[in-house]
Amino acid sequence: MTVPALEADALGKRFGRRSWALRDCSFRLPAGRVCAVVGPNGAGKSTLLALAAGLLAPTEGTVRVLGAHPAAARSRVGFVDQDKPLYPQLTVAETLRMGADLNPGHWDADTARRVVAGGDLDPDRRIRALSGGQRTRVALALALGKRPELLLLDEPMADLDPLARHELMGLLMGEAAAHGTTVVMSSHVVAELEDSCDHLLLVGGGKIRLSGDIDDLLAAHTWVTAPAGADLAAHEVVESRTTGRQLSAVIRPSGPLPDDWRTTTPSLEDLVLSYLRNPAAPALTPAPETLEAAV
């Protein structure tokens, strides 16, 4: 029996009397995957990661991390918050020593130093004197140095320039592959993640809209171009629009399509955007029996 890296059942979070940040979210993330958590600003991505990290308690439902309550799994999880909270008065070197002190027995000093060295950071420079991108590098060094089984990253590349983003993403993927680390990282920019991730959680309006391996999700959808007025009633329609005499649509086919329709597989970005533009489109997540079988 394989324990999922991250699983949620009817998970919900509400802050005070405000509207729900997340509601009725259920999914399973198999261990060893690199998962993109994608959605617009305010969709609930940060709330989901904070729940997984044990920084927030659910209002309803459950979340389990590596088969345990998030608090019990904390020593096996690395988390980089969107705000990169570090001690501003410490130097870079002191921050890495703190990481070693807090993670006795499983601190990888070489990896932490390599992440920092890639940014040409002065070890004696204080955190408060670093740029946003440099603080991101230090935060990632702490998270990777911990040698976690599950790495949670909330908008990790937002502060980085394109060269640093490419370099750090390559390092991150290399470390994950070498050690079998499950990586979950959020972004509202699909292009940042589609070349690196093999699993997707699409969050919109506090709900899980898509969940599964990216190849499977893409294979389940078809981009069709057909004459205006073509009958789509037999299929699940995610998005459709008509321009002149032509209809274009992203659908989940329920059977064979007419020979005069042009078909192709949508890109990941096209698929994500089609769901986000149409909140009423039916969600696609594994059925409950499939989730149980995965566990």
Please report, for each region that a protein language model flagged, where it lies by residue.
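A short, flexible loop at the N-terminus of ABC-type nucleotide-binding domains that lies
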Residues: M1-D24, P30-A31, A36
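The feature captures the beta-strand-to-loop junction immediately N-terminal to the Walker
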Residues: V38-P40
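Helix-to-loop junction immediately C-terminal to a conserved catalytic motif
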Residues: A53
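Conserved ABC transporter NBD signature motif
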Residues: E60-A73
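ABC-family P-loop ATPase nucleotide-binding domains
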Residues: Q82-V138
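Catalytic Walker B motif of ABC-type/P-loop ATPase nucleotide-binding domains
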Residues: L151-E155, L160
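ABC transporter nucleotide-binding domain
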Residues: H166-I251
